């Protein structure tokens, strides 16, 4: 499967923010929301990617990594290349959340960063769903479907 090159502006740059709470609480919230938004029943990444997370116990600082892998349907492990990473660590009196796009394509990558930032701040968000919902309408327009059918009426 060929993928187009990522722009230098979006690949492997880490977006960082400091938030309140504990690493364990921030990890639990980010993981819950990512699984619901990105991998839920109609999540845009459900068929193409695999969610993997590793978290230390709160007694050991609670640091955590969430890594999204490209889905590999080979005979063993379904985790292919790493595509997106969120790291969560204690920093000073807060929690450092680092968000790195490794292989996701735009505009999905930018929307995923927006989602993760919002979740780390305790906000509701699922911007990636708007892109996933817009795709069938755009495809219907390209195929010449009537406007009412494309709008889902």
Describe each model-derived feature in a short phrase:
Residues 2-153:
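Ser/Thr-rich, low-complexity intrinsically disordered terminal regions
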